[in-house]
């Protein structure tokens, strides 16, 4: 089972609102998901993005793959750098 961190479309016609969710890659875009880890509101200026850093970091360490859009959000929040550093530290520990 491959797990993705992706956008789940909410809102109404011409008023999009997205939840950032962890879901099985085989599930539909707006189908079942495992856990909600944030939201994205593109209507507000500037766009509002809320991320639950701890939950997202845990899922990334377990191997969840973010989609391109979510990866950009995570990079802006500094989570991708934190993940990279944590994986390097774990790799160095295993070599000792």
From Swiss-Prot:
Membership in a protein family: Belongs to the bacterial ribosomal protein bS16 family.
Keyword Ribosomal protein annotated: yes
Alphabetical list of InterPro entries matching this protein: Ribosomal_bS16, Ribosomal_bS16_dom_sf
Keywords carried by this UniProt record: Ribonucleoprotein, Ribosomal protein
GO annotation, biological process: translation
Naturally occurring in which organism (per UniProt): Oenococcus oeni (strain ATCC BAA-331 / PSU-1)
A Pfam family it matches: Ribosomal_S16
GO cellular component: cytoplasm; small ribosomal subunit
Annotated protein name in UniProt: Small ribosomal subunit protein bS16
Name of the gene encoding the protein in the UniProt record: rpsP
Single annotated GO MF: structural constituent of ribosome
